[in-house]
C-alpha cells in the first residue's frame, strides 16, 4: 500500500506485496540481527545516539558501517532508532498510561514504546488510576500518548503435526 518508504527489520516474512515493492525499488530494506534491532530501539528511547556491537562483523550486515577495534576485537557502530509511531499491546494499563506486560511481552514492548515519537497502546484491561501497584508498573505513563481497551483478544495456538495418527 506504499505507506512506508523504508523497512528496518530482522525478518520480513513472505508478504507478496512487500516483495514486489522491494524488487521494484519502491521500498528500501535494512536487515538487522534481532538483538541489535532491539538494542537500537532501546538506545533510541534512552537518548543514546549510537553504540558498538560485535554482532554482524564480517557479514553483509557490516557493509558501509563504521568499525572500531577495542582490545583487539572489531566492533560495528550501530545508530539508535526512533520511530514516528510505536504501537504496543499491554495486558493492563490505567487511564494515565501506566502499563503492565505479561510473559514474553515484557521483552521488547517497553523499549519499543520509549523509542516512538508517539506511542499508542492497546490494553486488554483498562483500569482506574491507582489500581496498579507502583512496583507492578513496567512502563510509566509518561511514554504513552494514547491508550484504549481492545476487544476480542483471541489467543491462537498453533497445532503442529509431525505425522499422521
Question: Each predicted region: which residue ranges?
Answer:
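Conserved alpha/beta enzyme-core scaffold
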Residues: 1-165
